[in-house]
Each structure stands twice: as C-alpha cells, then as structure tokens.
C-alpha cells in the first residue's frame, strides 16, 4: 500500500522523499552565475515548484536576494490590466526587499507600466552594485489567459535582452515555472529545464 508519509504537491526542502534529478544539478550550476534566465517547463505535478524552491535556496546560499511570486496566490483584482500586474510586481519587490525607493517614486503612466517597472528595478535594486536579485515566477501560466500576456512576457524578454546593453541587469536572475503548451511566449530565452525528463 502507499506510504501515508509520501508528499503530494511541492516537496519541502528538507523532505527525505525528494528525489534529486539531473535538473537539480543543472540549476545548482546555473543559479550562482550572473544574468541567467532559467525556464522550468512541464505539465502539472512533475516537480516544477519543488525545483524552483530549490533554485531559490541555491540563490540564497550564494548571497542573492530572492523574490518568489506564485501567480496562484495573486488576487484577481491585480489581473485587470498590464499596469495592475506590473504595479503589483513592483510593490512586492519593495516590500520583500525593503527598498528605500518606492514604486510611487518612479512610476510614470506617461511612460507606461513596463518602462515604469523597469526603471523601478534599476533605481530601487540594481543601482546598488552589491545587490544580486533572483526573481522566481511560479505558475506563470496564469498570465496566458489574459489579453495583456504579450506585454507581460515582452517585459520579461526585454529584461533578459537588456543585460547586453546595461551591466546592471546582469545582477538579475530570472526563474520561470510554466507548462509546456504556452511556451511559445517565452521560448528562445535562457536555459530551459524539464523536471519530467530529469
């Protein structure tokens, strides 16, 4: 019979039931580097969240500050527009990292939400040459049901590409967990990992 202690869903960092896979080793090798984008893709229940949690732990062990955004937990009211979700993103960064610069100090509707969030990250986090930040986006699939999805992932892609133009952006690592079906929106950036194949 099944062991009642076996866990379902995300497996805790200290769980004796977590089975380490090849993808864990790949993550452990990527995360300490600067300016990496890691895409963890696969259907539900293959260990994406567990792998993301371990990636976050590796980032912390390497002196990076981390922000974990689980899109399942975000209130529906923040998904009314691209501005809504990106402003929420900015407020979470400010709260979790206790930044002295606040979103209201930088946000400019005349520039639009993507540029405002980008400027906020630069001024609040990346201006500090000592700060390295890993942002984890779990269950990013939720974005795909909204009309602003292209704008959201264009913003992520712009941050990825910005590293070639502005060295500050090499202090930002991105880790994105998503299912295989909508991957076209974020294909061709970063290192793609599939826990189901590990």
Q: Which residues does each predicted region cover?
A:
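Conserved catalytic segments around the Walker B and adjacent sensor/switch elements
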Residues: 60-78, 135
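Conserved NTP-binding/hydrolysis module of P-loop NTPases
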Residues: 66, 79-102
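Short glycine-rich substrate-engagement loop in P-loop NTPases that contacts/grips substrate
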Residues: 77-83, 100-123
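The catalytic "switch" region of P-loop NTPases
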Residues: 142-198
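Walker A/P-loop-proximal flanking segment of P-loop NTPase domains
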Residues: 1-45, 50-59, 119-127
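Conserved helicase/translocase P-loop NTPase motor core
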Residues: 115-127, 155, 176
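Alpha-helical scaffold elements adjacent to nucleotide-binding pockets in ATP/GTP-utilizing enzyme cores
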Residues: 50-55, 84-92, 151-159, 196
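Conserved P-loop NTPase "ATPase switch" module shared by AAA+ and STAND
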Residues: 106, 124-152, 159
């Amino acid at each position: 019979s099944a062991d009642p202690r076996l866990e379902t869903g995300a497996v805790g960092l200290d769980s004796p039931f977590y089975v380490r896979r090849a993808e864990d080793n790949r993550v452990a090798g990527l995360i300490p580097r600067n300016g990496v984008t890691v895409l963890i893709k696969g259907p539900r229940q293959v260990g994406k969240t567990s792998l993301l949690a371990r990636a976050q732990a590796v980032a912390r062990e390497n002196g990076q500050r981390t922000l974990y955004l689980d899109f399942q937990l975000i209130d529906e009211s923040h998904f009314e527009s691209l501005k809504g979700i990106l402003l929420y993103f900015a407020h979470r960064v400010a709260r979790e990292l206790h930044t002295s610069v606040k979103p209201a100090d930088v946000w400019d509707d005349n520039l639009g939400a993507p540029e405002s969030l980008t400027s906020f990250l630069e001024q609040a986090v990346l201006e500090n040459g000592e700060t390295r930040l890993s942002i984890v986006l779990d269950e990013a699939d939720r974005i795909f049901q909204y009309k602003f999805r292209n704008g959201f992932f264009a913003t992520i892609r712009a941050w990825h590409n910005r590293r070639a133009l502005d060295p500050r952006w090499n202090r930002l690592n991105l880790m994105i967990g998503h299912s295989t079906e909508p991957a076209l929106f974020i294909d061709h950036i970063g290192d793609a990992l599939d826990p189901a194949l590990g």
